[in-house]
């Protein structure tokens, strides 16, 4: 049995060195580009990430023999080229095999298809962005 749930807390807004304005564009994926509202598009991107991680963790041979039930916070970076990678994974409890889960999540995000990076519209440039992705992982043998 495997489950991956979204925590009630909404992910934090993007954090970057430049001041973010309402007209700037958050990172997204092709599946979300037709969503007009900025917040809805960002939520579509988060849902894409949740589904990507959930489906790939569920189908990973590496998790088949693990027991894991914890809340985690993945600090994700999307660079200006659209590469996605975690800068840090924080586990609420350390009683589980967090090193193995940590390794699996790093591999999954490193192998994730490129996304559309954030755009600083007043400068017309693609920028690196960072945000927190909270998850509850419940893996049972």
Annotated model-derived regions:
Residues 4-141:
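Charge-biased low-complexity segments
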């Amino acid at each position: 049995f495997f489950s991956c749930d979204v925590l009630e807390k909404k992910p934090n807004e993007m954090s970057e060195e430049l001041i973010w304005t309402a007209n700037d564009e958050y990172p997204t994926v092709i599946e979300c580009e037709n969503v007009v509202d900025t917040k809805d598009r960002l939520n579509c991107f988060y849902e894409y990430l949740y589904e990507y991680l959930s489906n790939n963790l569920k189908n990973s041979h590496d998790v088949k023999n693990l027991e894991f039930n914890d809340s985690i916070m993945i600090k994700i970076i999307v660079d200006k080229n659209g590469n996605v990678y975690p800068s840090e994974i924080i586990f609420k409890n350390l009683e589980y095999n967090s090193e193995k889960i940590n390794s699996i999540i790093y591999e999954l995000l490193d192998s994730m298809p490129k996304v559309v990076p954030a755009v600083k519209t007043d400068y017309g440039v693609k920028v690196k962005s960072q945000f927190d992705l909270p998850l509850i992982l419940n893996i049972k043998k």
